[in-house]
Amino acid sequence: MRVSLRWLRELVAVDLDVTMLADRLTMAGFEVEDIEDRRTWAEGVVVGYILACEPHPNAQKLRVCQVDVGQGEPRTIVCGAPNAAAGLYVPVALPGAYLAKIDLKIRPAKLRGVKSEGMICSLAELGLTKESEGIHTFTDAVTVGEDVRPLLGLDDVILHLTSTANRADALSMVGIAREVAALTGAPLTLPTPRAIAPKKSGAKGPVQLAIADPQACPAYCGTLITHVQIAPSPLWLQQRLEAAGLRAINNVVDITNYILLKWGQPLHAFDWDRLQKVAAQTPVSVGVRFAKAGETLKTLDGQERRLSSENLLITAGDVPVALAGVMGGEETEVHPGTQNVFLEAALFASPVIRRSARAQGLRTEASARYERGVNPAELEAATAEAIALLKEIAQGTVSDTTLADQRPPLERTLTLRLEQVHRLLGAVVSEAEDSDEPAYLDPETVEELLSRLGFHLSRQETLEDELVVWSVTVPPYRFRDIEREVDLIEEIARLYGYDRFEETLPAQTEVGALPLELTLLREVRAAFRGAGLTELMHYSWVKGGQPNQVTVVNPLVAEFSSLRTDLITGLVQAFRYNHEQGNPPLNGFEIGRVFGQDEEGLWENDRLGGIIGGDPWQGKWVRRSQQPQPLTWYEAKGILESVFQRFGLNVEYQSDRHDERLHPGRTAVLCLQGERLGIFGQLHPQYAATLEIPAAIYVFELDLEVLLSRLEERYRQIVFQPFSTYPASDRDLAFFAPTALTVAELSRTIWKAAGGRDSFLESVELFDEYSGSGVPAGQRSLAFRLTYRASDRTLTEAEVNELHQRIRDSLVEKYAVTLRS
């Protein structure tokens, strides 16, 4: 917003230097982006009177003027303007003057042999317009030799000010004046509101108001003013508009723009006779409604606009005549022949105008204010001043005023606690240099600061030991942005000055961190991604018909009628879908919740499921003689085992046949420290064939709570131990064992025979399995590699042999295996 310092000083008697005022406003939250000092634009330019104007002897387009500038002898000035003539009062830049807007220093010079002692100026050369057809001439009474700056509005300073989105009241000169008065303590001089006596909507008269949606238009005031005389506005009004960046049009339109700048209340003037013609009825029904499909409106910018249901309209006889709160229509605009006007002053809902303007890609001074929120309390004051100016400047006569008013009450009372003020703002900078005690705002200062802003405070009854508590009444013009106690405290800090409070750090700070459970979940996800699995996510809702499911009574669709009881089903279906689409085999995992019910009631817990069906050869370079091979049980188990090893978990695998979806000979229950962790196995060939997917697909499902609890134990008690620098000794152990005997059972026996994890046995690894020719019936050939190592010395051959033989004897004794090596 462009704020004229000269206009501002008419409203508030502030005598601060403009730089200091700009600094105070900026510190109070109204950033001054630029200071436009117009006083420098025409320094050294005075009023001159052209006594004579003759053609230049050596140039056809130049004229030689004799100009009286009030300094004795007339000055000879060469001028090229086509409108230069004797008898005109003109602005003259004397030698030594500097025209800042065109960066020109005036010096005496010879032009085509004729001496020129100055320059007769156009408005463009003085910075008031971009282009000019000739020199500027004064039509009002002026005095030769006087400074032209007061005559042209160049004795002013313009502050380019930006307000925050919540301060809609600051988009007006009255709002800024109130703020400056509060910041500086200077007296505020606002015009006394004139009274208007509108009749209620529905009463007999030339205008009938029809508001279709009071939520979109809480108040609408229409005034019929007759016998107006359209003419140029007086100079002071034109200068006010020009300083604000608006173009003067005629006295009626200029008055509406002036009120918008002063009060922040948009107004619009319709040509009454044209409005009657459009309505084609008496009395004229002026309405406010949303647009209908297919309606159009030609706006003041000459564009034919196709309207949508988001556009709020002003209508005459239900015919659109204006985009409410945005722009008027061309058909009813005020023109040089206008004799009667209908003046609109209304309140429109901010969201409605925002959507309407966005839908049309149109933003105006009016819509900018409506989008922020117009002060509902001063509608009558703005209307009354506009009517008074129309009577004074346009010689109009008020014929009728109608008001449709459904504004909500604008009263708000808040409780303010001095204790809360001290807690949020802290101590103030003490004026006593030798004082070590922190100083805080006292009640009197708080009351003074808020009173300056127009708040009314009354102290409540408090006990002797308690701090002061106030009941604060919010002024109507701050009704939109002051809603809570903290808003009042912000106003106190803003007015007192943020730089006048002590710089204090919070008494206690705590470094932010993820909870341990989330940290472990992130590590689990990273581990499975590192093993080549992609994280998947499925709906918790599945098709019903399975036992123990929790079913919804009235599902939206049958496919999502029950809650899932496991993750494996969803993972297999995802594999099947990708297989049907021709995508590569799926390797993925999912962390999710499963649900069920039993005789004890409903239950739910978190699980981690996965599917491993990736072909290790697909998409790879292979030898021509080599065919892609499906994943083996041990390869799939190795992927899962790599994750467990990453976390240092010793998981045992025990044969299991309970899940009919899984291969009975290739399914294992996973146990961790004697507690069931989950299940791992290959899909049953018949189940895979039913789904028309490959048989070499492996799935697992883990109890997430068990997994995280074990990880949490290790996380809280991390044990570091050095690597052994001594050599290891490997021994291979091969034997025939019954097929029903699991590798997990054999591994446990080997470790137990060696003396546990603290023995010289470092690792046990199965590296070969064979069943077929040469192997006794009902048995298989297994080969283990055992690694022995000590942490403090090199083991002797005798020590290794003794321990290795103990393990061999234990296997023979317990399982009657047939040793092969």
From Swiss-Prot:
InterPro entries: aa-tRNA-synth_II/BPL/LPL, B3/B4_tRNA-bd, DNA-bd_dom_put_sf, Fdx_antiC-bd, Fdx_antiC-bd_sf, NA-bd_OB-fold, Phe-tRNA-ligase_IIc_bsu, Phe-tRNA-ligase_IIc_bsu_bact. One of its GO terms (molecular function) is phenylalanine-tRNA ligase activity. This is Phenylalanine--tRNA ligase beta subunit. Tetramer of two alpha and two beta subunits. The keyword Ligase applies. Residues 409-503 form the B5 domain. It catalyses: tRNA(Phe) + L-phenylalanine + ATP = L-phenylalanyl-tRNA(Phe) + AMP + diphosphate + H(+). GO terms for biological process: phenylalanyl-tRNA aminoacylation. Residues 724-820 form the FDX-ACB domain. It comes from Thermosynechococcus vestitus (strain NIES-2133 / IAM M-273 / BP-1). One of its GO terms (cellular component) is phenylalanine-tRNA ligase complex. The gene is pheT. HAMAP family: Phe_tRNA_synth_beta1. Keywords: Aminoacyl-tRNA synthetase, ATP-binding, Cytoplasm, Ligase, Magnesium, Metal-binding, Nucleotide-binding, Protein biosynthesis, RNA-binding, tRNA-binding. Its EC number is 6.1.1.20. It comes from the Bacteria.
